Curated annotation (Swiss-Prot):
Any matching Pfam family: UDG
Location of the protein in the cell: Cytoplasm
Name of this protein: Uracil-DNA glycosylase
Record keywords, A-Z: Cytoplasm, DNA damage, DNA repair, Hydrolase
Matching PROSITE patterns: U_DNA_GLYCOSYLASE (PS00130)
Organism of this sequence: Ralstonia pickettii (strain 12J)
Presence of the UniProt keyword GTP-binding in the record: no
Known role: Excises uracil residues from the DNA which can arise as a result of misincorporation of dUMP residues by DNA polymerase or due to deamination of cytosine.
Length: 263
């Protein structure tokens, strides 16, 4: 099922993309209030048991101090894929902290989906290796050259980072500020509700989350697709076909991995 942005989200993010230095930032609490009801139900217990007010104060304060904080739409992954529709979870670490140039404008690479970048932004090295693995598994080339993965999100792939914000040019700058506890709780909740799912854990950071997942799910582990580690076992891992074979056996719709972009 393709889920469109709800009216609350649309009201927050209806402005055209702007230069990276001028990116607006909607307060975190306001973005949480705009979440779809299903995700809000999942996240409310997580918010209640973590330092959410302090995290909001930190992120909003950094932005108020004039620091470019990426992405603008922090919870975009949750707006594109409903709880019931999540069939595959691909876990990232923190958002891209760099920028790209589109039509002469500098814009953030991060747009709320792990490993994904806005259309027109150069495909990052890790995503190039993900594409390379998919092409090898399915024996054909991916159409186009975009790194925007919203098509996967609309098919039921939750592209989730464990940290949801970052300062421009400062990798892991928002790590250990409270996001990890919230996304850990989200993963635990997601693993407990509804149907069984596929979890793709690439690299030691993602694999450390294995203990959060209840039994019965398909958990696929491999080295990170970064150029530093992809040749140590990510390339050749077979995860995408394995995921589809398992989903088919569960009588769930499979993912068309050859269509990462939205229709």
């Amino acid at each position: 099922m393709t889920r469109r942005a709800n009216p609350a989200q649309a009201a927050l993010f209806d402005e055209p993309a702007v230069d990276a230095a001028d990116v607006s930032f909607i307060p975190l609490a306001q973005q949480f209030d705009a979440l779809p009801a299903d995700w809000k139900a999942v996240l409310t217990p997580c918010i209640a048991q973590t330092n959410w007010p302090e995290l909001c104060a930190f992120v909003d304060g950094e932005r108020a101090a004039g620091k470019p904080i990426f992405p603008t739409d922090v919870f975009r992954a949750l707006h594109l894929t409903s709880v019931d529709d999540v069939r595959v979870v691909i876990l990232g670490q923190d958002p891209y902290h760099g920028t790209g140039t589109v039509d002469g404008r500098e814009i953030p690479q991060a747009h709320g989906l792990a490993f994904s970048v806005p259309a027109g932004v150069r495909v990052p090295p890790s995503l190039r290796n993900i594409y390379k693995e998919i092409e090898a598994e399915f024996g054909c080339k991916l159409p186009g050259t975009s790194g925007n993965l919203e098509g996967w999100a609309q098919q039921g792939v939750l592209l989730l980072n464990t940290v949801l914000t970052v300062e421009q040019g400062q990798a892991a700058s928002h790590a250990k500020r409270g996001w990890e506890r919230i996304t850990d709780c989200l993963l635990e909740q997601l693993a407990r509700v509804g149907h069984k799912r596929v979890f793709m854990l690439w690299g030691s950071h993602a694999q450390a989350k294995r203990a959060l997942l209840s039994d019965g799910h398909l958990v696929l582990e491999a080295p990170h697709p970064s150029p530093l580690s992809a040749h140590r076992g990510f390339l050749g891992c077979g995860h995408f076909k394995t995921a589809n074979d398992w989903l088919a056996a569960q009588r769930q719709p499979t993912i068309d991995w050859l269509k990462p972009q939205a229709a």
